[in-house]
Design a protein with these regions (language model features):
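Generic structural "secondary-structure junction" signal
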Residues: 35, 42, 81-82, 86-89, ...
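Conserved Nudix-box catalytic region and its N-terminal flanking loop in Nudix hydrolases
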Residues: 21-72
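Residues within alpha-helical segments
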Residues: 15, 51, 55, 148-151
Length: 157
């Protein structure tokens, strides 16, 4: 999706974990190993965007990890908050505020089979913490850190 706003866009990144492995994609355009994710569209909330992006990019339905607070009154719907937030520069004049979610496949019986989104990605794979170090091109330290925290936190649940 193209940028929605001129200065800052809101995005989601989803680190899906099963059996102590995290799902990562090799992004064609960026030539980087990344989690699933993308822009939050104007007609959706962050939770909806995380579920949509995960399904579009991997074919997997997931449960987001986190606490859903009680609602506070009529017209209020509580959302699962992201595990982390960051802001990262895309260009000299554009930034993304990233909402970083951890998730696990809804179907926990067996192994969820990820489907490659060929128009966007060169590869998709489940990696252990150790396998992240062997990816080519090398995964950024930040993405590797989030991946390892996700494996540690979700892999034990």
């Amino acid at each position: 999706m193209a940028h929605i706003h001129e200065k800052i866009d809101f995005t989601v990144a989803i680190f899906v974990v099963q059996q102590s492995r995290v799902l990562v994609i090799h992004h064609k355009k960026l030539n980087k190993w990344l989690p699933l994710g993308g822009h939050i569209e104007l007609d959706e909330d962050p939770e909806q965007a995380a579920l949509r992006e995960t399904k579009e990019e991997s074919g997997i339905d997931v449960d987001l990890i986190g606490e859903r607070p009680p609602t506070t009154g009529p017209g209020t719907r509580a959302l699962i908050g992201p595990r982390f937030l960051d802001i990262h520069r895309i260009s000299e004049k554009h930034e993304h505020i990233g909402m970083i979610y951890f998730a696990r496949p809804k179907n926990r019986a067996g192994t969820a089979q990820a489907t490659l989104a060929q128009s966007e990605h060169n590869d998709i794979r489940w990696c252990t913490s150790q396998e992240l170090d062997a990816l080519v091109p090398a995964m950024s330290d930040a993405v590797k850190w989030y991946s390892r925290v996700a494996i540690e936190e979700v892999g034990s649940r």
